[in-house]
Amino acid sequence: MLKKHPFITKDELERITKKYPTPFHIYDEAEIMRRVRLLQKAFSWNPGFREFFAIKATPNPTIIKLLRDLGCGCDCATATELVLADACGVTGSNIMLSSNDTPPEDFKRAAAQGAIINLDAGGDMLDTLDVALGGVLPDSICARFNPGGTFESANGIIGNPADAKFGMTEAQLFETFRVLRDRGVKVFGLHAFLASNAREQDYYPKLARILFELAVRLHRKLGIHIG
C-alpha cells in the first residue's frame, strides 16, 4: 500500500493563509506533472495510450488545462462536465462520456463535441442513444463491463462488482455489441471500474487481464475489433 506524505509544511501553510483566507484547496503542480509523466512512460509501449481524467474527481479548470497540456483527455459523466471539458480546450475523441441513466440531451451534446460514448447498459440506454442521434450511430462506441462477483487483490477483497449498479454482464455486453455491429459500428472499446480508490499494486494488472481476455472472446465470437 502506498503511503501519503504532506507536500507542504505547517509553516508554509501558515504563511499562505496570511495572504489567502481559508478554506481553500492547494495542489502540487510539479507532483501532478511528475506522476502523469511516469504513467505515460509506463505505457509508452502503446503509442495509442491516453489517460482520461475523471472531471468529477476535481472539476477545476486549472487542473483540467494542466492535464490537457500533458496530453490527457477528460472522462465526463454529465452535460455540465462536457461543457467544462470543451471550455478547457479538450475536444473530440479526447473526451469520453461515461454516464448512467443518461438523458438524450447528454448523448446529443457528446456526439456534437465528437466525444467517445461509453455505454453503461444496452437495452433502453441503447434505444435512448439511437433516438437522440436520429438513428445514426458513431463509428466507435465503448461499453462498461461488470464481471459480477468480488474483486480480490493480494490484500483481500477490494471491490464487490456484483453489488454495483454500473456496467453490463458478459451476456449483456455480447448482445449489445452484436446489435451495434449490425448497426454499422466499426470500433469497440471496453471499460471497467471494479473498485474505488484502489491503490493495491495488483489491481490494474488483474483488471487488464480480465479486459484483454474478454476482448479475445468478443473478437472470436462476433468478429469485432476492440480498438
Model-derived features: positions:
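A charged N-terminal "starter" segment
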Residues: 1-119, 123-139, 175, 180-182, ...
